[in-house]
Amino acid sequence: MNILNGGAHAESNVDVQEFMVVPHGFQSFSEALRAGVEIYHSLKTNLKQEGLLGGVGDEGGFAPNLSRNEEGLRLVREAIEVAGYAPGKEVSIALDVAAQEFFDGSNYLIDGELISGTNLGRKYSDWLDEYPIVSIEDPFGEDDWDSWKEFTSREGHRVQIVGDDLYVTNPKRLEKGISIQASNAILIKLNQIGTFTETMEVIRKSKEAGFGTIISHRSGETSDDI
């Protein structure tokens, strides 16, 4: 559930595109949904109390201006706690960094600093040490394969590392990602590759490689079953 927006999805100074909560310590979908809604409203209250309540992003999350991206993680963790849930045990955090948006082809402009992919990976490692993060989508630019490989080699055992912009549901890009172990999961978007046949090929290859396979919604999708 997307509760705090930045990047291209919001008119704010936050670089990370999506901060999400993942309710997983529940027996039913209805209980998990209730937890997500309560945390969303808890975050709204916290933002208001700190004078940070502003607009809403494209994905429905709040879009405050923050001093640093890590402040978003703090706010989400506190919202989980204030709502009465245990961070990491009942509800965890997922990120869609969409790092391509602040990648210049060599370095990353995040928190007002221009840093290398290696140092960005270290920043993520620090976040993993401090916050109950279970998934990070697009932590690096779509052609920064070395940073993907380095980070997945170091942290893939403790967090889901999802390629979306990295793979664009393309079987050839996925083959490269599998060969160098660039990630351990892929986001599937049918309209990126354009045919059911190619989409199913990507799903098959990702599962054979042991990747987590996530079927994405699309912002402009209809109510049709297919």
Spell out what each predicted region is.
Residues 18-29, 53-69, 98-111:
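Active-site-proximal beta-alpha loop/turn segments in soluble metabolic enzymes
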